């Protein structure tokens, strides 16, 4: 995920044990039948430029975390624990509506897609991802604020 290639299913194993290497080699086609040459190529390309990709993505996350933090501070009826790392946050809201119902309404009425807190056995909150375009994040948060004011 850190390389913005969350759809790739890749992994490497490092060992000096030749028996382990032989066993892995025998099972590779069975275990990774859906991983193709393109996946290998993209993963290799990402690793060849890992510092540049990491810094780009880190900059996006830091900027967006600040956008989210300012929004939480400026928006009445919401609170959260500011994330130290990661790409998501649990934002708590002060409305008497189950998180699943809230999320269904948000997607229907505002086009917003959040994960209900009930998915994590935590009512009264939604999980918000912030690892994408900063302008889109700000627009989405504004729509969420509008919804909270309207309801």
Please annotate each region the language model reported:
Residues 1-2, 18-20, 85-87, 96, ...:
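Short, solvent-exposed loop/turn segments at secondary-structure junctions
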Residues 2-62, 69-71:
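Conserved core segment of the aminotransferase class I/II
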Residues 11, 43, 61, 68, ...:
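Generic structural signal for small/hydrophobic residues in well-ordered secondary structure
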Residues 16, 48, 92-94, 131-133:
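Residue-level recognition of strand-loop junctions within catalytic nucleotide-signaling folds
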Residues 44, 59-69, 80-93, 124:
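Conserved glycine-rich beta-strand-loop-beta hairpin in the small C-terminal domain of fold type I
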Residues 76-80, 112-117:
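A short linear hydrophobic-aromatic micro-motif
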Residues 96-97, 105-114, 120-151:
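PLP-dependent enzyme catalytic core of the Aspartate aminotransferase-like
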């Amino acid at each position: 995920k850190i390389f913005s290639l969350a759809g790739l299913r890749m992994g490497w194993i490092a060992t000096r044990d030749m028996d382990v290497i032989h066993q892995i080699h025998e099972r590779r086609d069975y275990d990774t039948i859906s991983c193709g040459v393109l996946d290998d190529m993209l993963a290799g390309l990402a690793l060849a430029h890992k510092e540049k990709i990491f810094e780009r993505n880190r900059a996006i996350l830091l900027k967006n975390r600040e956008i989210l933090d300012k929004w939480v501070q400026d928006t009445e009826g919401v609170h959260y624990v500011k994330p130290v790392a990661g790409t998501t946050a649990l934002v708590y809201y002060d409305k008497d509506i189950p998180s699943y119902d809230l999320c269904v309404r948000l997607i229907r009425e505002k086009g917003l897609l959040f994960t209900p807190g009930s998915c994590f056995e935590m009512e009264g909150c939604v999980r918000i991802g912030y690892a994408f375009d900063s302008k889109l994040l700000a627009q989405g948060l504004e729509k969420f604020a509008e919804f909270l004011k309207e309801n």
